[in-house]
Each structure stands twice: as C-alpha cells, then as structure tokens.
C-alpha cells in the first residue's frame, strides 16, 4: 500500500484538527480528499508529507514510517501545498533547475524541459515567476512536485486560481500521472473530485465520514438510511450482528460506527 494512515490524531490544545482517522491509498489510485474548508484536509496532507508532526497515530508511505524517516519520505513524495511557496525573483526554468538539483535529478536540463511541457508552462517558461498569473504560478508548483518523478503525489487543491480551460488541462495531467503513481488530491468542490478520482475520502471537522467509490456514494438508495453513532469506550462492530434492522456496519473509528438500516 502506497499510503497508509492509522488512527491519525492532531490536536491543537483542546481542538482536534484531525480526529483518529484511518485510510489507505494504493498504487495507481487517484483518490479525492473531499471536505469543507477547515475540515482537516491540509493538516492531514502536511502530516503525510512529513512537514507536520502528529499528536498520535501512524502514517506509512511506501512502507516507511513518516515520523521516523521524514527525509527519506520527501524523496518519494511530490507535494503541492495549498499555499504554494515560490521564489518570485527567479525565472521559471531557473527555479525548476534549482529544484531538480536539490533532488539530485539526472539530466536536470532535459527533466526541466519535460515537466515544463507536461504542465503546459512552455509559453511562460522564460519569465520570472513573479510575472506569472496565479494559474501559471500553480503550474510551476505542480512542475516542481513532479520533477523528481515521485512515487506518490500529494496535491492540496491543485486547481485553485485556474480558469476553466486550465482546470481541464491540469485534470488531464493528474489523470496521466495517476496511471503509474499514487495520487491523493484534495478539494472542497465535489465536481472536481468527480472529474478525476477513482475513490473519495470525505472528512468533516477532522472526522472521516465516508470512504468509498464515487459510484457507490452516488447510488443513494432511497430505501436505505444510515446513522453515525459514537460510544464512550472502544467497541467491536460484532456487537451489531444479528440486529434485524441493521443491514450494514462500518467502523469509522474505535468508538464511532456508521450503521445502515
């Protein structure tokens, strides 16, 4: 499994930004990480990429414990953060060449040419980053995330600031990368996730509320209803077996269950 998150908890004082969530993402999957602003998506992604320490729980990327080997993890991950930090006084190719050298990429010049073409930066590639539109700055960040050919891509709202045509182009780039890589792609817009993702993980107020394929989530059988219940102490979902009114039980956390009737 390329990404494995186990009972991840991140607390800021009394606030639980991420509340004991667990999920897995396999190679070749493009998984949408959906939720409203402030749901905990960016916090989770920062922990997965080794830029933020969790309060408890474990995260593994390509079998490596992120908390124990944060530098090794960064070699395997291409990360586009929500706030894309760029050097505005550097030229596009100059900056990407610098990133390639940091990652010790073989043939940095040809690699820069490849990613510039891949993300559609060619017309603007000789400009300073500070002269670019917000959409093209976003492309520079995506190119930097791809430059070392990582196994895993973590993209935090990658289409922010793009016009409709640019959004379609970037979606195609992400789809192509998803054939050989693991992609976790966050958004607060359902249509964005529908366009490119195989599966959706939904989080709200730090709690995982759904983890399923789009087709299953969209079926919406009107005869079925579900309720989420939480107990004080951890329980095994076997306690719900034999109850005629419950057709399906999903354990969201050790004390939290989704019951379908």
Task: Please identify what each model-predicted range represents.
Residues 169-260:
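ABC transporter nucleotide-binding domain
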